[in-house]
Amino acid sequence: PQLLILDEPANYLDLLYQKQVFDLIREWVKKPGRAVVSVVHDLSLAKAYGTNAVLMHRGRIISSGSVGEVLSKANLRVAYDMDIYEWMNKMLSQWQ
């Protein structure tokens, strides 16, 4: 196939296997003419592995474009009705 359409391809996997799945997808898509469209709710995975994104809230598109543009603090606040950056930093600080 030249196009993979995936719905949460690493859902319920341990972290090691999530990384392996996305590393395999990244290698597969490097060949010319190939593309991947994937639903991913894990923002860290989307940011690490995605190139373009569509951010939705209540069935409507809020933003689409490069991952960096789409996953901005302002867009995420609209999508999640909270400061995602603050929450994720708080969660990460537990590991430091």
Kindly give the residue locations of the regions a language model identified:
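Catalytic Walker B motif of ABC-type/P-loop ATPase nucleotide-binding domains
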Residues: L4-E8
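Helix N-cap at the start of a conserved alpha-helix in ABC-type nucleotide-binding domains
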Residues: L15-Y17
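Helical segment within the ABC ATPase nucleotide-binding domain
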Residues: K19-K31
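H-loop/switch region of ABC-family ATPase nucleotide-binding domains
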Residues: V40-H41
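A short, surface-exposed alpha-helical micro-motif characterized by mixed small hydrophobic
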Residues: A46-A48
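ABC ATPase "signature
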Residues: S64-G65
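ABC ATPase nucleotide-binding domains
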Residues: K73-Q96
